[in-house]
Structure formats: structure tokens, C-alpha cells
Amino acid sequence: VPSMEGPFDYPYIFKKKVDQFGANTHIIHGEKEEKKLAALLKSPDYFAQEIIRGNTEYATHIIFKQGKILHSLNIKYIFHLEMGIKGKDESITRICHCPYLEIFSAILKSIGFEGVCCFNYKVRNNIPYIIEINPRFGGSLSRYFSVIV
């Protein structure tokens, strides 16, 4: 998981805890943005996080039951921007292999999760940095649902 302990070097990401499609996600490049978002920076509904640079992000959709992955689908997002925000910025999507299913399975097993979920993450030095885990049907799965079932 990218660091959530500030203060952060610029740029860093600032987002609403409960959100859809990055609508309330901001990349803070400096003091100018911090001043502009001063009220939100103090809100308990938001949090800041280290940004993982790169124009590629992944969403791994998983159906998990009895401690095992029954089905999974990995979607790769390639943004035109180095630090694109999924849902806000334009990207190209591709279905691809996920080499981190054992890690994701161990996480889900450790919290006793069963059901459908989605891991959103970026990769740095072959290590997945989990941006979020959505314990629900991920929005990006809808157009590929027939592939996973």
C-alpha cells in the first residue's frame, strides 16, 4: 500500500474515502493546490497518499469463496498522462495476466473475505502497490462480465 503517513513530497494524491470514478480525487503538485483545497484537507472524509508514478494502473476483479479464487479478470489501464486518475482521465484498456493472484488471495483469506471484489493497484519494481480494494462488483468489470463467468 502506498504510504498514507504525511507529510508527503510533491506530488501526492488526495481523495475522498467513498467516491466513484475518481470524481473527488486530486493530484497535489504544490502549495497552490493545497491552499485551493484547504478545507477538504482537514475533512475526515478525505485522505492523502503517496502517489505511485507511472501511466499504468490495474484492476483485478476476483470472485473469492472458501479461501480460493474461483475466477479473476485483470484489466490494464494505460493513461496518456503519467499520473492519470482512473475514471477522470482518458485511458486505453486491455485484459492481461495478473501475476499477483497469490498475494491478493492471501490478503482476502487473512480478512475472512468471501464474495466479489476488485483490487486497484500500480506496480513499481515488480511490487503491486494497492490503491484500494473495493468489496463489490467493480465498475470496470461491467463490459467484461461475460469473460469472468
Give the location of each predicted region:
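ATP-dependent carboxylate/phosphate-activation module, predominantly the ATP-grasp catalytic core
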Residues: 50-111, 134-149
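A glycine-centered beta-loop-beta connector
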Residues: 66-68, 123-127
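Active-site nucleotide/adenylate-binding loops and adjacent lid/helix of ATP-dependent enzymes
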Residues: 1-54, 64-69, 94-101
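Short secondary-structure junctions
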Residues: 43-44, 111-113
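A short glycine-rich, hydrophobically flanked beta-strand micro-motif that places a catalytic Asp/Glu
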Residues: 114-125
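Short hydrophobic/aromatic beta-strand element in the GNAT-like acyltransferase core
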Residues: 45, 59, 118
